[in-house]
Amino acid sequence: QEIRYTCDASGSVISYHVSLTTDLSAISDPPRDSCVWEELTVADAVYALAISSANDAANVLAEGVSGSIEAFAQRMNERAAELGALDTHFVNPNGLPNSEHYTTAYDMAQITAEALKNPDFLLYFGSGAYEMPATNISQARSLVCKNQFIDGERSCSGLLFSKTGWTTSAQ
C-alpha cells in the first residue's frame, strides 16, 4: 500500500485508509515544488524535504504520522529525550523559527547518530538530486540540491551528508 499526500490551497490531505487534514496556515514558507491537489508518494515528499527544503512536505508528513504538527513535535521531543538530547525542544517538523524551538550541537549529534542507523536516511539526505516522477498533475521534474557540500562544489573529508537552510530571522 502506498501513502500519498495531496496539497490544496486551503489545506492538505494524507490518505492511508483515512484522510487527515493539514492546516497550511502552520507553514510560514510557501510550498516549494508541490502544486494544488498534487499527489506525491511519501518517498517523493521526503526527497523534496531533504533536497529542496520543502517545509510543506515536512508538515504534511508530520500530520500523516501523528495527526497534527503539535502531536508530531511532542513525539520528536519524547524521542529526543530518549536519546539523551535534553537541551532540545521542537515545536514544528520543519525547523522554521519559533521562540520555543531550540537545540544544541551536542543534542543534534545525538539525534543524527540515531538517524544514521537507518540506511534510508543517507539515501534521502545524501542525495544531490532526484528525478521526481510524473504525478497526477505534473510532469516529471528534477530536484537539485543547492548545498555545495552535496553537489560537489566543495568538499569535506568524511562528510556523509549535510543539510542547509535559510530564513530571514536566521541572518
Q: Could you say what each language-model-derived stretch is?
A:
Residues 13, 27-59, 140-161:
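Conserved catalytic neighborhood of penicillin-recognizing serine enzymes
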Residues 22-24, 36-38, 63-65, 94:
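A mature extracytoplasmic/lumenal domain signature
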